[in-house]
Amino acid sequence: MIKYFTFSFSIAFISWIVGMIVTPLLSKMDFFKGLSSLSFIKNDRINTLIGLQLFKWLIMHSFFKYFNPKLSVKKRILKTELEEYRAEMTTAELNHLFAFAFMGVFIIIKLFQGLYLFAAVMLLFNILMNLYPSLLQQHNKRRIDRYLHILNQRS
């Protein structure tokens, strides 16, 4: 069982690197713009029900907050900076989505091998380390979009 956890954790970190490599390669393709406006869960109530607020708190109060310093805001942010911040958030979101897909391949392999518990552990790690961060980025992008909409109405 320990082997399942260590392997899953290792593959999750490797998947982050794969995501960081794949995203810039695909950013030059036409369909990338469609990917940058994905929104899987638009309802804030559902986000709360699946524990996204708790996940956000855990990220903000753990060592994970240091993983992408470009996504931390220490001061009041200007409108132009907010748009750059949103673009960086989109990149981070897509990194995690591609990492989720990469790790999904390993999960499918384990299922075909009949290692169902191993696949379940990997799926849990994949959800926590790739899907939830992506959902959190989408949630934060929607918040930024609402704020930008208000700023555009005022000007």
Regions found by a protein language model. Give the residues of each.
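Long, highly hydrophobic alpha-helical transmembrane signal-anchor segments
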Residues: 1-41, 95-113
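Weak global preference for isoleucine
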Residues: 2, 11-17, 21, 41, ...
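Alpha-helical transmembrane segments of integral membrane proteins
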Residues: 3, 7, 11, 87, ...
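Membrane-proximal soluble regions of multi-pass membrane proteins
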Residues: 28-81, 85, 150-155
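Loop-to-transmembrane boundary segments
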Residues: 78-99
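Hydrophobic transmembrane alpha-helices
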Residues: 95-142
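Cytosolic/matrix-facing juxtamembrane and C-terminal tails of multi-pass cellular membrane proteins
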Residues: 135-155
